[in-house]
Design a protein with these regions (language model features):
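Substrate-binding pocket helix/loop in short-chain dehydrogenase/reductase
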Residues: 95-96, 103-108, 213
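Active-site helix of classical SDR
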Residues: 119, 155, 163
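Conserved glycine-rich Rossmann-like NAD(P)H-binding loop of the short-chain dehydrogenase/reductase
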Residues: 24-41
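Conserved glycine-rich cofactor-binding loop
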Residues: 10-12
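Residue(s) in the substrate-gating loop at a strand-loop-helix junction
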Residues: 139
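C-terminal substrate-recognition "lid" of short-chain dehydrogenase/reductases
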Residues: 116-119, 123, 131, 219-250, ...
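Short, small/polar-rich loop/turn modules that mediate ligand/substrate recognition or access, typified
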Residues: 171, 176, 243-245
């Protein structure tokens, strides 16, 4: 039975990925922020979904030692870590000249450096066992830029560079590394943003979706969390053993333009 660590998995995309792995019989290590009771309820719910066991570790993604402990604790519990899904991320939108340096540091730390620390801690075990899967959740913003998102765009571009390097270093050890690059994803957070934008701009929510949120996506449809989760599961499989070092857009045609 294989074991997967998914960071930022107490809500949104990460939770959807964790659920799919749990349903398919993996041991799952959750990580993320939230109310303690709600996190435990989520863990318990996922624990009933499949044959594997689901645990939670509250490592702070800005603390390398805590990330190392996350990996060590999971290895001690399950014997091995087979799959990493670096997903944790935050966002801040501001002009470069007004962008708070502390926000820049936090976004680079959580969205990029935490993935490095996670991979660094797990890589020796993966090399020893001659198997590993690293599946980072990057973004269309790892391939293209948007104004006012300097830190996020820099971090996601950096993630693709990290993934390519991991793919090259891991190739002879049966380790693959790939990045999923979603466009706009339908999550509760985005739904709230739609409502707020509609109110602020005196627009209908439908017009906000097509003319503002999904303007960049030719399909004019949100990416679904389940679609990302399905791709992550496939990339973890033996059938995907020759897919490595890839940035895989799932963005309704955004980056094809």
């Amino acid at each position: 039975m294989k074991t997967v660590i998914v960071t930022g998995s107490t809500s949104g995309i990460g939770l959807g990925i964790a659920e799919n792995f749990a349903i398919n019989g993996f041991n799952v290590v959750l990580n993320g922020l939230g109310d303690e009771k709600e996190i435990e309820a989520t863990r318990a719910r996922l624990d009933t979904m499949g044959a594997g066991e689901v645990i939670f570790h509250g490592a702070n993604m800005l603390e390398p030692e805590e990330i190392s402990d996350l990996v060590k604790s999971a290895e001690k519990k399950f014997g091995a870590i087979d799959i990493l899904v670096p997903n944790a991320g935050i966002q801040h939108v501001e002009k470069i000249e007004d962008f708070p340096p502390a926000k820049w540091d936090a976004i680079i730390g959580i969205n990029l450096s935490s993935a490095f620390h996670l991979i660094r801690a797990a890589m020796p075990g993966m090399k020893e066992r001659k198997f590993g899967r690293v599946i980072s959740i990057a973004s269309a913003h790892g391939l293209v830029a948007s104004p006012y998102k300097s830190a996020y765009v820099a971090a996601k571009h950096g993630m693709l560079g990290l993934i390519k390097t991991v793919a090259l270093e891991g190739a002879e050890f049966g380790i693959t590394a790939n990045a999923i690059c979603p466009g706009y994803v339908e999550t509760p957070l985005v739904s709230g943003q739609i409502a707020d934008t509609a109110k602020a701009r005196n627009m209908s929510e439908e017009d906000v979706v097509t003319e503002v949120i999904l303007k960049a996506q030719p399909t004019k449809q949100f990416v679904q969390v389940g679609q990302i989760a399905a791709l992550a599961l496939y990339l973890s499989s033996e059938q995907a053993a020759q897919i490595t070092g890839a940035a895989l857009p799932m963005d309704g045609g955004w980056t094809a333009q």
